[in-house]
């Protein structure tokens, strides 16, 4: 029977499959360096079982050093395939190689222990088979023993004394057979040995008071897990005499060699102490040992039967081999130092060090009744060993308040701390890089003060009650009033009883203590502090005219009477679908009269508004698989390509088109809106690559890279064909006729980018989009929307919500600005002075949508969850404001005046388009 390294799964052992550790180290590929950044990975195929390594960023010399455990047989052929992973097309095969496991085992004497193999990678193309590089792999953890040799004729009779009874085995079927010896507690090992091997001392047993006992606890304990099987060692069976009775373990040569496991040295005492050590197998004792006064090691003795199996001529020379056991009493063999153990550190409690028949040191954990090859070390500081309710051992790290199944060592803890330190350094460097345009904290105190710097010779202090006062070092006096609020040095003094003060927004006003009144007019010259200075910026848009024209078309085509819609709140979606699809499209232009079953409400407009809100929340819910979120960082919707799983999906999209058209026709708003590219498709406008960034940033960046780089120099092999996966099914699509055979070059890559952009917006949703637009056009002709753009259509459909300025200010955070910074004061002044449409445009510019969550500004969502509206100080006063819709952040440069801030903000809101990356 073939044996190999121990495995945790005993079912594979019985089925003949063994575990092999395959370490894919590295590869050297004969290919040009790829600047596109493809990832390389290796695929290992073993009898239909496929395992893959991680992806390596190196395109010519990838390194993995990844260990894969596979189930093999001695006749298995390992197949290695090296692949190049691409984002825009299918993975490309770079080369493959095979390993005949049977041939490798024969080459390395049926033992694979860290065997390094250099495999030649090859690839078949139109020119034949070409060499594409080399792959380095390491095979480990597999040992195959010799096949059984049956030869009963040469086996002498064997007598085993057990409880005073003699058991004979001489090939006679009538005789009793020798019982099997237990190994590893579960798998029995045949007690026969081939003609070329003998039983090692790990299988020895002793007779104590006539009872047959194992020679060591290791016969019951399990062998160390994940360790290769020890080689068979030829040594003699031992015979110990206890209380006048002897026992011996002899082997027949008619069976195979079993799996051996490490065991402690066999010792026995009979008024004499004997310590045993490992000796080289099958070696004659020195001549001086025959007259030694001490009993030699039992493991060093070789019996006549075992000796004859190895060397037939050795019988005459070793007739007195058992006489060595009977030595004078009182002799003690001196303890021999174990050369293999140089570590003098004490073992933890409950651990024991032992040696197997090969002289290898292993360790026994009596706490868990397990063995291991690695020397146990005490737990690092702050760690604790515990056992859960199911008896499993785990370890608690009180330093980080975490748990793990793996026993920690000082080295593993040190490696983790080193990795954590490197990660913190990298994060610090990235933070410094991201803040390269920001101002230092020392500059913020003076610039954020709305009153500016103090006059020369003045100092601002705080007393013990945290009250601010000012010191005039010129006159050596103090005062509570801020000298900057009492007029400038070149201004005329205020009249008697007047004082200058400032509002929270930083606007100056005057207090007349004589009449106890306040005013914004300066009593010295009559000028108002709130007068709008500078040229007025024209702000005119035709949206109101467009909306009025659309409302006129709707009213002109409205039909008399009304149409009843009777629905239940529990089955709102299905009831509405059945009733709307049962009506004629022109009947949906009548005034709506909505009835909720079981409720007595009369619809004078309020129930219809609620019906539109609730139904839009239902039909656009991504859980129905009809729509999906357009991106990871927003909650706008687009058609889901996987909606085809519903056999009636086209009818539902036609219903949704009618419903959206009804909302526009009757002037109602829906709960959730679509993405801007979807609105452009409704308006029959051409979609550009800029529109792609808001829904698929990774795809957009890939196309931009192709546009800005020379793909021929990078060696990219792209064709006018693309693959798409929907519900696990991969389909191929040609961007143009015969595109799978047309190579993308520098001359035609612009056409390729345009076709890829068009395909990305329409992939898998052509029929759904057509059904939606057909249903929409039945109620509201699409020609009525030709004057609007996509942003105006979103405002019409989702509504222009009245913004709560107090809620907006209360849920706004500032970075490198404070609430009292003059730029922040000017910003909120600008928001208050503009109308609701400009506020919606500003909100859409910063957050990507003009709609707010149900909880207002406090529940604005960003890329990583809730993200409040943020204003950050970035750049110079000549820059335009920038927005980060993923984080709801506005980059507001430090403008010098309110007029400059207002001009830049309006220009950014109205005239800018698209996204960019810093």
Swiss-Prot record:
Map out region (Required for interaction with and ubiquitination of AMOTL2. Required for interaction with YAP1) in residue numbers.
345-527
Q: Where is this region: Interaction with ERBB4?
A: 345-525
Q: Do you know which InterPro entries this protein is assigned to? A: C2_dom, C2_domain_sf, E3_ub_ligase_SMURF1, E3_ubiq-protein_ligase, HECT_dom, Hect_E3_ubiquitin_ligase, WW_dom, WW_dom_sf
Q: Where is the WW domain?
A: 345-378, 377-410, 452-485, 492-525
Swiss-Prot/TrEMBL site (Required for ubiquitin-thioester formation) positions = 886
Describe PTMs of this protein.
Auto-ubiquitinated and ubiquitinated by RNF11.
Q: Where is the composition biased (Low complexity)?
A: 266-281
Per its record, the protein catalyses: S-ubiquitinyl-[E2 ubiquitin-conjugating enzyme]-L-cysteine + [acceptor protein]-L-lysine = [E2 ubiquitin-conjugating enzyme]-L-cysteine + N(6)-ubiquitinyl-[acceptor protein]-L-lysine
- The enzyme's first-digit EC class, named in words, is transferase
Q: Which cysteines are joined by disulfide bonds?
A: none
Residues at the active site: 886 (glycyl thioester intermediate)
Segments of skewed composition (Polar residues):
150-164, 209-219, 235-258
**CC terms in the record's Gene Ontology section:** anchoring junction; cytosol; nucleus; plasma membrane
Q: In what residue span(s) does the C2 domain sit?
A: 1-116
User: Tell me, what controls this protein's activity?
Assistant: Activated by NDFIP1- and NDFIP2-binding.
- Write out the GO biological process terms: lung development; negative regulation of DNA-templated transcription; proteasome-mediated ubiquitin-dependent protein catabolic process; protein ubiquitination; T cell differentiation
| SUPFAM superfamilies in the cross-refs | C2 domain (Calcium/lipid-binding domain, CaLB), Hect, E3 ligase catalytic domain, WW domain
* Region named Disordered: 150-182, 209-360
The compartments listed are: Cytoplasm; Cell membrane; Nucleus; Cell junction
A GO molecular function held by the record: ubiquitin protein ligase activity
Q: What is known of its domains?
A: The WW domains mediate interaction with PPxY motif-containing proteins.
Briefly, what is this protein's role? Answer: E3 ubiquitin-protein ligase which accepts ubiquitin from an E2 ubiquitin-conjugating enzyme in the form of a thioester and then directly transfers the ubiquitin to targeted substrates. Ubiquitinates and promotes degradation of SMAD2 in response to TGF-beta signaling, which requires interaction with TGIF. Ubiquitinates ERBB4 isoforms JM-A CYT-1 and JM-B CYT-1, KLF2, KLF5 and TP63 and promotes their proteasomal degradation. Ubiquitinates RNF11 without targeting it for degradation. Ubiquitinates and promotes degradation of TGFBR1; the ubiquitination is enhanced by SMAD7.
Q: Which PANTHER family match?
A: HECT DOMAIN UBIQUITIN-PROTEIN LIGASE, NEDD4-LIKE E3 UBIQUITIN-PROTEIN LIGASE WWP1
Subunit field text: Interacts with the Crumbs complex components PALS1 and PATJ; interaction with the Crumbs complex is enhanced by WWP1's interaction with AMOTL2 and facilitates WWP1 localization to the plasma membrane. Interaction with the Crumbs complex promotes WWP1 monoubiquitination of AMOTL2, which activates the Hippo signaling pathway. Binds SCNN1A, SCNN1B, SCNN1G, WBP1, WBP2, DRPLA and adenovirus type 2 PIII. Interacts with TGIF. Binds KLF2 AND HIVEP3. Interacts with RNF11. Interacts with SPART. Interacts with NDFIP1 and NDFIP2; this interaction activates the E3 ubiquitin-protein ligase.
**Can you name this protein?**
NEDD4-like E3 ubiquitin-protein ligase WWP1
Species name = Mus musculus
| Organism placement in taxonomy | Eukaryota, Metazoa, Chordata, Craniata, Vertebrata
Q: Which gene encodes it?
A: Wwp1
């Amino acid at each position: 029977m073939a044996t190999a390294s121990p495995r945790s799964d005993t079912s594979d052992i019985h089925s003949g499959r063994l575990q092999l550790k395959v370490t894919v180290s590295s590869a050297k590929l004969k290919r040009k360096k790829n600047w596109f950044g493809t990832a390389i990975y290796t695929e290992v195929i073993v009898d239909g079982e496929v395992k893959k390594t991680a992806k390596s960023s190196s395109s010519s010399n990838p390194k993995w050093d990844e260990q894969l455990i596979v189930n093999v047989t001695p006749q298995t052929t390992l197949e290695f395939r090296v692949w190049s992973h691409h984002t825009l097309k299918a993975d490309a095969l770079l080369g493959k190689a095979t390993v005949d496991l049977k041939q490798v085992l024969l080459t390395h004497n049926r033992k694979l222990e860290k065997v390094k193999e250099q495999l030649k990678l090859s690839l078949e193309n139109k020119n034949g088979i070409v060499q594409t590089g080399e792959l380095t792999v390491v095979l480990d953890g597999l040992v195959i023993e010799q096949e059984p040799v049956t030869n009963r004729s040469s086996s002498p009779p064997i007598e085993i004394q057990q409880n005073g009874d003699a058991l004979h085995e001489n090939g006679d079927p009538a005789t009793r057979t020798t019982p099997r010896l237990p190994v590893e507690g579960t798998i029995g090992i045949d007690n026969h040995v081939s003609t070329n091997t003998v039983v090692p001392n790990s299988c020895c047993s002793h007779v104590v008071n006539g009872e047959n006992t194992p020679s060591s606890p290791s016969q019951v304990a399990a062998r160390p897990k994940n360790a290769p099987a020890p080689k068979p060692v030829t040594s003699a069976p031992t015979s110990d005499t206890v209380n006048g009775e002897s026992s011996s373990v002899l082997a027949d040569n008619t069976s195979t060699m079993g799996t051996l496991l490490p065991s402690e040295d066999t010792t026995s005492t009979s008024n004499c102490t004997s310590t045993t050590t490992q000796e080289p197998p099958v070696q004659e004792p020195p001549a001086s040992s025959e007259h030694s006064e001490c009993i030699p090691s039992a493991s060093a003795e070789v019996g006549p039967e075992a000796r004859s199996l190895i060397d037939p001529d050795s019988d005459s020379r070793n007739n007195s081999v058992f006489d060595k056991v009977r030595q004078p009493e009182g002799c003690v063999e001196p303890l021999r130092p174990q050369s293999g153990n140089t570590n003098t550190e004490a073992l933890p409690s409950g651990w024991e060090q032992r040696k197997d028949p090969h002289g290898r040191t292993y360790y026994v954990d009596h706490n868990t009744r397990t063995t291991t090859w690695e020397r146990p070390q005490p737990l690092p500081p702050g760690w604790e060993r515990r056992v859960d309710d199911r008896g499993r051992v785990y370890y608690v790290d009180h330093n980080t308040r975490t748990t793990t199944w793996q026993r920690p060592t000082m080295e593993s803890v040190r490696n983790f701390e080193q990795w954590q330190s490197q990660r913190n350094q990298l994060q610090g460097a990235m933070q410094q890089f991201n803040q390269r345009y920001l101002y230092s904290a020392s500059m913020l105190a003076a610039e954020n003060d709305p009153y500016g710097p103090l006059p020369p010779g003045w100092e601002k202090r705080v007393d013990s009650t945290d009250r601010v006062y000012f010191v005039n070092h010129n006159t050596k006096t103090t005062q509570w009033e801020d000298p900057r609020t009492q007029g400038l040095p070149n201004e005329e003094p205020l009249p008697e009883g007047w004082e200058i003060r400032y509002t929270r927004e930083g606007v100056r006003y005057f207090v007349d203590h004589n009449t106890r009144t306040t005013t914004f007019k300066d009593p010295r010259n009559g000028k108002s502090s709130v007068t709008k200075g500078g040229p007025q910026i024209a702000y005119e848009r035709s949206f109101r005219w467009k909306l009025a024209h659309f409302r006129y078309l709707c009213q002109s085509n409205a039909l008399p009477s009304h149409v009843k819609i009777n629905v239940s709140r529990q089955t709102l979606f299905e009831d509405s679908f059945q009733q709307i699809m049962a009506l004629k499209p022109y009947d949906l232009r009548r005034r709506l009269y909505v009835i909720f079953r079981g409720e007595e409400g009369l619809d004078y407009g309020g129930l219809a508004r609620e019906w539109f809100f609730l139904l839009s929340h239902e039909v656009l819910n991504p859980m129905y698989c009809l729509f999906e979120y357009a991106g990871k960082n927003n909650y706008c919707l687009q058609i889901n390509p996987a909606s085809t799983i519903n056999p009636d999906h086209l009818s539902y999209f036609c219903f949704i088109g009618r419903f959206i058209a009804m909302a526009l026709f009757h002037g109602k708003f829906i709960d959730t809106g679509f993405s801007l590219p979807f609105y452009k498709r409704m308006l029959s406008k051409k979609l550009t690559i800029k529109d792609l960034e808001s829904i698929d940033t990774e795809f957009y960046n890939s196309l931009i890279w192709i546009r800005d780089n020379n793909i021929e120099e990078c060696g990219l092999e792209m064709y006018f064909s693309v693959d798409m996966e929907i519900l696990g099914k991969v389909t191929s699509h040609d961007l143009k006729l015969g595109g799978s055979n047309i190579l993308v070059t520098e001359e035609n890559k612009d056409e390729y980018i345009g076709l890829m952009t068009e395909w990305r917006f329409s992939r898998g949703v052509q029929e759904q989009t057509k059904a939606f637009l057909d249903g929409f056009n039945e109620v509201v002709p699409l020609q009525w929307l030709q004057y609007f753009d996509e942003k105006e259509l979103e405002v019409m459909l989702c509504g222009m919500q009245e913004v709560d300025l107090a809620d907006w200010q209360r849920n706004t955070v500032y970075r490198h600005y404070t609430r009292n910074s003059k730029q922040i004061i000017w910003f909120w002044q600008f928001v208050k002075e503009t109308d609701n449409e400009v506020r919606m445009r500003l909100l859409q510019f910063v957050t990507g949508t003009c709609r707010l969550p149900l909880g207002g500004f406090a529940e604005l969502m960003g890329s990583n969850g809730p993200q409040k509206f943020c204003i950050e100080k970035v750049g110079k006063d000549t820059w335009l404001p920038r927005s980060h819709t993923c984080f709801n952040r506005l980059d507001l440069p430090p403008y010098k005046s309110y007029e400059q801030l207002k001009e830049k903000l309006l220009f950014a809101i109205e005239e800018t388009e698209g996204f960019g990356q810093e």
